[in-house]
Amino acid sequence: MQESSEQDRETEKMDLKEIMAQRVFAVAGDTLNEEKYAYKIKQGLLAQGYTVYCVGKELKSFNDIPGDIDIIDMCIHPAKGLALIKECSKDFKCIVIQPGAESGELLEYLDERGLPYLQGCVLVGLSVYGRGRS
């Protein structure tokens, strides 16, 4: 991340409605296992016409994603998620931290760098604010 981008983000906060208005999502987690929430989130986003990239089982890093990322959705063990964020050199608008993907260390890292995040659920966002909803 570039320093100026980090500073610009310090004042930016997004709510779930704004997050669901974005187009490009990077889902971090096991998106290949039908039993996992990352898979369900991936399928839900794709079904509603979002562009989705999957990091963890499909791509190894957010840096492997071609083009821009709007939203990073963390649906992965907190230690793995923190490692992915630490190595990320791409700009993004917000990180959604799914229930169970949070840790004190992750939140502290994001806060210290002024990286925008929301603790919430993209599946809820899809049902309430997804494309085709008003």
Protein language model features and the residues they cover:
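Mid-chain, well-packed structural core segment of small domains
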Residues: 65-104
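A charged, well-structured terminal subsegment
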Residues: 128-134
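Rossmann-fold NAD(P)-binding glycine/threonine-rich loop
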Residues: 99-126
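A short helix->loop->beta-strand "cap" motif at the edges of active sites that frequently abuts
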Residues: 50, 90-95, 113-115
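Hydrophobic, well-ordered beta-alpha structural blocks that scaffold small-molecule cofactor pockets
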Residues: 1-63
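Active-site regions of enzymes building and remodeling cell-envelope glycoconjugates
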Residues: 58-72, 114-117
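Generic structural signal for hydrophobic
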Residues: 45, 87-88, 110
